[in-house]
Amino acid sequence: MKLIALGDNVIDYYHNTQECFPGGNAVNVAVHAARLGAQAEYLGSLGDDDMAHIVEKALRENGVDISHCPVLQGRTTKVCSYDVVNGERSFIEVITGESWTGPLQIGAQELDELKTADLIVSSCNAKMPEQMAAVQALPAVFAYDFGEKEKYRTDAYYDEVCHGIDLAMLSCKPMDKAAFAELCAPLHRRGVVHVLATMGAAGQMLSVQGK
Protein backbone atom coordinates (compact mmCIF):
# COMPACT_ATOMS: atom_id res chain seq x y z
CA MET A 1 0.00 0.00 0.00
CA LYS A 2 1.25 3.46 -0.88
CA LEU A 3 0.29 6.33 1.41
CA ILE A 4 0.88 9.99 0.62
CA ALA A 5 0.63 12.40 3.55
CA LEU A 6 -0.26 15.78 2.11
CA GLY A 7 0.32 19.08 3.83
CA ASP A 8 2.15 20.62 6.74
CA ASN A 9 5.61 20.40 8.21
CA VAL A 10 6.79 22.33 11.26
CA ILE A 11 9.49 22.37 13.89
CA ASP A 12 8.42 21.99 17.51
CA TYR A 13 10.85 24.06 19.59
CA TYR A 14 10.97 23.68 23.37
CA HIS A 15 12.32 26.83 25.01
CA ASN A 16 13.17 25.49 28.43
CA THR A 17 15.03 22.45 27.08
CA GLN A 18 16.30 24.13 23.88
CA GLU A 19 15.35 21.07 21.82
CA CYS A 20 13.96 20.94 18.28
CA PHE A 21 11.82 18.14 16.86
CA PRO A 22 10.28 17.76 13.39
CA GLY A 23 6.51 17.68 13.33
CA GLY A 24 3.32 18.59 11.57
CA ASN A 25 0.29 16.37 11.03
CA ALA A 26 1.34 15.16 7.58
CA VAL A 27 4.95 14.53 8.61
CA ASN A 28 3.84 12.51 11.63
CA VAL A 29 1.42 10.43 9.55
CA ALA A 30 4.09 9.66 6.95
CA VAL A 31 6.67 8.63 9.55
CA HIS A 32 4.31 6.38 11.50
CA ALA A 33 3.05 4.76 8.29
CA ALA A 34 6.62 4.02 7.21
CA ARG A 35 7.45 2.55 10.61
CA LEU A 36 4.44 0.25 10.26
CA GLY A 37 5.72 -1.02 6.93
CA ALA A 38 3.75 1.05 4.42
CA GLN A 39 5.27 2.68 1.37
CA ALA A 40 5.05 6.24 2.67
CA GLU A 41 5.57 9.59 1.01
CA TYR A 42 5.37 13.13 2.32
CA LEU A 43 4.20 15.83 -0.10
CA GLY A 44 4.45 19.43 1.03
CA SER A 45 6.44 22.62 0.54
CA LEU A 46 9.90 22.64 2.13
CA GLY A 47 12.08 25.63 2.90
CA ASP A 48 15.85 25.69 2.58
CA ASP A 49 16.69 26.84 6.12
CA ASP A 50 18.31 24.81 8.89
CA MET A 51 14.91 23.86 10.32
CA ALA A 52 13.84 22.39 6.97
CA HIS A 53 16.98 20.28 6.95
CA ILE A 54 15.96 18.80 10.31
CA VAL A 55 12.57 17.84 8.85
CA GLU A 56 14.12 16.37 5.70
CA LYS A 57 16.69 14.37 7.67
CA ALA A 58 14.06 12.85 9.94
CA LEU A 59 11.83 11.88 7.02
CA ARG A 60 14.68 10.24 5.11
CA GLU A 61 15.93 8.39 8.20
CA ASN A 62 12.46 6.93 8.66
CA GLY A 63 12.22 5.75 5.06
CA VAL A 64 9.75 8.38 3.86
CA ASP A 65 9.95 9.47 0.22
CA ILE A 66 10.25 13.27 -0.15
CA SER A 67 11.47 13.30 -3.74
CA HIS A 68 8.40 15.16 -5.02
CA CYS A 69 8.45 17.97 -2.45
CA PRO A 70 9.17 21.42 -3.88
CA VAL A 71 12.09 23.08 -2.07
CA LEU A 72 11.52 26.84 -2.05
CA GLN A 73 14.72 28.86 -2.06
CA GLY A 74 15.01 31.56 0.58
CA ARG A 75 11.89 30.35 2.40
CA THR A 76 11.66 29.30 6.03
CA THR A 77 9.95 26.62 8.12
CA LYS A 78 7.10 27.31 10.53
CA VAL A 79 8.17 26.96 14.18
CA CYS A 80 5.78 26.10 17.01
CA SER A 81 7.22 27.12 20.38
CA TYR A 82 6.48 25.37 23.66
CA ASP A 83 7.70 24.96 27.22
CA VAL A 84 7.54 21.63 29.03
CA VAL A 85 5.76 21.99 32.39
CA ASN A 86 5.35 18.94 34.66
CA GLY A 87 5.87 16.64 31.72
CA GLU A 88 3.24 18.37 29.55
CA ARG A 89 3.96 20.84 26.80
CA SER A 90 2.60 24.36 27.15
CA PHE A 91 2.05 26.32 23.94
CA ILE A 92 3.81 29.70 23.58
CA GLU A 93 3.55 30.89 19.97
CA VAL A 94 3.74 30.08 16.28
CA ILE A 95 6.51 31.76 14.30
CA THR A 96 6.06 31.90 10.54
CA GLY A 97 8.14 34.96 9.70
CA GLU A 98 7.91 36.88 6.44
CA SER A 99 9.42 34.07 4.34
CA TRP A 100 7.39 31.03 5.44
CA THR A 101 6.95 28.50 2.65
CA GLY A 102 3.19 28.56 3.03
CA PRO A 103 0.84 25.77 1.91
CA LEU A 104 1.70 23.51 -1.00
CA GLN A 105 0.25 24.70 -4.30
CA ILE A 106 -0.95 21.65 -6.19
CA GLY A 107 -0.15 21.69 -9.89
CA ALA A 108 -0.16 19.09 -12.64
CA GLN A 109 2.99 17.38 -11.35
CA GLU A 110 1.64 17.07 -7.82
CA LEU A 111 -1.69 15.72 -9.10
CA ASP A 112 0.13 13.12 -11.19
CA GLU A 113 2.06 12.00 -8.12
CA LEU A 114 -1.06 11.89 -5.96
CA LYS A 115 -2.66 9.59 -8.54
CA THR A 116 -0.08 6.93 -7.60
CA ALA A 117 -1.35 6.69 -4.01
CA ASP A 118 -3.69 4.09 -2.57
CA LEU A 119 -4.38 6.33 0.42
CA ILE A 120 -4.06 10.11 0.77
CA VAL A 121 -4.14 11.68 4.22
CA SER A 122 -4.41 15.43 4.80
CA SER A 123 -5.69 17.77 7.49
CA CYS A 124 -6.92 21.21 8.42
CA ASN A 125 -3.32 22.06 9.33
CA ALA A 126 -2.33 21.76 5.67
CA LYS A 127 -4.13 25.11 5.12
CA MET A 128 -5.27 23.92 1.68
CA PRO A 129 -9.09 23.79 1.90
CA GLU A 130 -9.65 25.31 -1.53
CA GLN A 131 -7.52 22.57 -3.11
CA MET A 132 -9.21 19.58 -1.50
CA ALA A 133 -11.86 19.07 -4.20
CA ALA A 134 -9.19 18.30 -6.80
CA VAL A 135 -7.45 15.84 -4.47
CA GLN A 136 -10.65 14.05 -3.48
CA ALA A 137 -11.52 13.55 -7.15
CA LEU A 138 -8.55 11.18 -7.46
CA PRO A 139 -8.94 7.38 -7.18
CA ALA A 140 -7.22 7.02 -3.78
CA VAL A 141 -9.02 6.53 -0.49
CA PHE A 142 -9.00 9.96 1.19
CA ALA A 143 -8.76 10.64 4.94
CA TYR A 144 -8.95 14.11 6.48
CA ASP A 145 -8.14 15.21 10.02
CA PHE A 146 -10.30 18.11 11.22
CA GLY A 147 -8.29 18.49 14.42
CA GLU A 148 -9.80 19.96 17.57
CA LYS A 149 -10.51 23.63 16.80
CA GLU A 150 -14.08 24.83 16.36
CA LYS A 151 -13.15 27.00 13.36
CA TYR A 152 -12.69 23.78 11.40
CA ARG A 153 -16.18 22.52 12.33
CA THR A 154 -18.33 25.18 10.70
CA ASP A 155 -20.76 24.65 7.83
CA ALA A 156 -18.66 26.95 5.66
CA TYR A 157 -15.49 24.94 6.27
CA TYR A 158 -17.27 21.62 5.75
CA ASP A 159 -18.69 22.92 2.46
CA GLU A 160 -15.20 23.88 1.31
CA VAL A 161 -13.42 20.60 2.10
CA CYS A 162 -16.04 17.82 1.88
CA HIS A 163 -16.07 16.62 -1.72
CA GLY A 164 -15.53 12.88 -1.26
CA ILE A 165 -13.97 12.19 2.15
CA ASP A 166 -13.84 8.50 3.02
CA LEU A 167 -12.71 9.02 6.63
CA ALA A 168 -13.05 12.18 8.71
CA MET A 169 -11.11 12.32 11.98
CA LEU A 170 -11.76 14.72 14.84
CA SER A 171 -10.04 15.20 18.20
CA CYS A 172 -12.70 15.64 20.87
CA LYS A 173 -13.42 15.85 24.55
CA PRO A 174 -15.27 12.85 26.01
CA MET A 175 -18.90 12.78 24.81
CA ASP A 176 -21.94 10.53 24.83
CA LYS A 177 -23.47 8.83 21.80
CA ALA A 178 -26.05 11.56 21.26
CA ALA A 179 -23.40 14.27 21.12
CA PHE A 180 -21.32 12.12 18.79
CA ALA A 181 -24.27 11.63 16.45
CA GLU A 182 -24.79 15.41 16.40
CA LEU A 183 -21.10 15.91 15.58
CA CYS A 184 -21.26 13.41 12.72
CA ALA A 185 -24.51 14.56 11.13
CA PRO A 186 -23.21 17.54 9.09
CA LEU A 187 -20.32 15.45 7.80
CA HIS A 188 -22.51 12.53 6.76
CA ARG A 189 -24.88 14.98 5.03
CA ARG A 190 -21.93 16.05 2.91
CA GLY A 191 -21.12 12.51 1.86
CA VAL A 192 -18.46 11.59 4.41
CA VAL A 193 -18.64 7.81 4.85
CA HIS A 194 -16.74 7.22 8.11
CA VAL A 195 -16.37 9.66 11.02
CA LEU A 196 -13.89 8.86 13.79
CA ALA A 197 -13.76 10.83 17.04
CA THR A 198 -10.75 10.28 19.28
CA MET A 199 -11.19 11.27 22.92
CA GLY A 200 -7.86 10.60 24.56
CA ALA A 201 -8.11 8.22 27.50
CA ALA A 202 -11.89 8.03 26.97
CA GLY A 203 -11.36 6.06 23.78
CA GLN A 204 -12.83 6.44 20.32
CA MET A 205 -16.17 6.35 18.52
CA LEU A 206 -16.76 5.53 14.86
CA SER A 207 -19.83 6.30 12.77
CA VAL A 208 -20.34 4.61 9.39
CA GLN A 209 -22.87 6.61 7.38
CA GLY A 210 -24.69 7.46 10.58
CA LYS A 211 -24.75 3.93 12.02
Q: Language-model segments: which ranges?
A:
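Ribokinase/PfkB-type carbohydrate-kinase core domain
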Residues: 1-4, 58-60, 66-69, 85-210
